[in-house]
Amino acid sequence: MKIRKAAVIGAGVMGAAIAAQLANAGIPVLLLDIVLPDKPDRNFLAKAGVERALKARPAAFMDNDRAKLIEVGNLEDDLKKLKDCDWILEAIIEKLDAKRDLWAKVEGVAKKTAIISSNSSGIPMHLQIEGRSEDFQRRFVGAHFFNPPRYLHLLEVIPTDKTDPEVVKTFSEFAENTLGKGVVVANDVPGFVANRIGVYGIVRAMQHMEKFGLTPAEVDQLTGPALGRASSATFRTADLSGLDIISHVATDLGAATPDDEDFTLTENFKNIVAKGILGDKSGSGFYKKTKDEKGKTKILNLNLQTGEYEDQGKVKVAAVEAVKGKPLAERVNALYTAEGKEGDFLRASMNDGFWYAAKMAGNVSNRLQDIDNALKWGFGWEQGPFESMDALGVQQVIKNLEADG
């Protein structure tokens, strides 16, 4: 079956951005949302989603003319239009009952060949389709995009044990060849692949930062491009994602995996979130943009001990300065074996990541390569954890893990 027309239900940040990416690929898309009783325009939310996508930075559309491929509507007047769609994706509120109610309505109007998907990042796929027909369950597969979907390559495709393998194959080929995504087939477990391992790494980095007496800016120097990872590193990534989102995801993962490893957030982090310091969305997080007396933008750093923002100037870390200009393999090896608290922090954090990735092999996905790709495509790493272990020498890593207990 060929996907010629799609529908996205939910015109929030993710839903509208996914609709824009479909339009970028030349796929006509129906964008639906609820009716707001206090708005005379019954399509207000869907229209607002398109307008937001048109103004998004970085740009959600390759060309703003692509927005013409998006037809807006609402769930009361336009649900019947789903019968013309080959792929139907939901991106609504993260509440199980809301998703189940939606799928009951969708099943009543969607054509019997349509592929049905959820973009949920935290609600298990198999729970969403309880009570649906066998035919519906056969055509259902999770499709978890990363934000912003035009720029982050990863798409986690999550079948349930009821999903037809041909549906997984057809949809994965569409995602790769038409949408240009990097597909990782994930198991239907908490956090799937990238968030399960990536958020664990962020939480452990926070714990080790406090243990070894480092600052967020120093940690970002150590866990950014020098280590072959995204320029946003650890704490800038947290600010971009939203500290409340990190808190929510980590808390949910901890609750969903009680026998798993430590997803406990530090008290300092909890206090920051409780104060409404949520990252970019609130105007400040671990970092805060401000202007000096000349109107020039400068970045202030949050002092976790005092709770105040400080101008720390350009933060330099000796271990990072020493590897500038060297190839990635040399940088990673030098940082992993560095002396002092910086080296202690990196070894502890990297060893945690290596151990957890190895533990999750066969749990979150059935291929080691998928775990590497999920971190590279979803978090902007140059090397996945298994590729890094190979580069450092697996036996050396095992020796260090055993020494750490």
Please annotate each region the language model reported.
Residues 1-405:
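N-terminal glycine-rich phosphate-binding loop for ADP-containing cofactors
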